[in-house]
Amino acid sequence: MIKDRDEYLNNVMKKILNSYSIIENLSDRPIDLELLEVEVRKINGFLLVLSKKVILLGNNSSNTKNLEKKIIFYMQNYDFSREINLLLDTYSEDSLRVRNIRDSVLKSLNENKLIQKIHDMSNNF
């Protein structure tokens, strides 16, 4: 059971890191804005799953509590869906705006060292 639980959490973390890597490697073309939207949605969904699973599985280590706090902070403070939709509707051809929103997404995930925490924990499973 514990191995399955840890494996499941590790898979969710790896999916978050994969989406983060995709966002990092976008080239700021108009089509990349659509990819950014998809990857941000994936990350948000996986963060919610990760947060809920950590709580439900009763893993109360300081590492998981710290991760949960970082996820809650991110979810409460960052939502790029409105901005991305606005850009898709009006400025999707402006590569500078695409780059700026991509940089904002990356910065938000690095703030409070959320991605670093996920990376470290996924390597320790």
Regions inferred by a protein language model and the residue ranges of each:
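Short terminal alpha-helical segments
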Residues: 1-46
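Short, solvent-exposed, charged loop/turn and helix-capping segments
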Residues: 46-72
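Amphipathic alpha-helical binding modules
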Residues: 73-125
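Exposed, low-complexity/repetitive linear segments and helix-based recognition motifs
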Residues: 3, 21, 34-36, 65, ...
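Residue-level recognition of alpha-helical coiled-coils
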Residues: 28, 52, 59, 66, ...
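Charged, low-complexity interaction regions
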Residues: 24-36, 57-62, 87-100
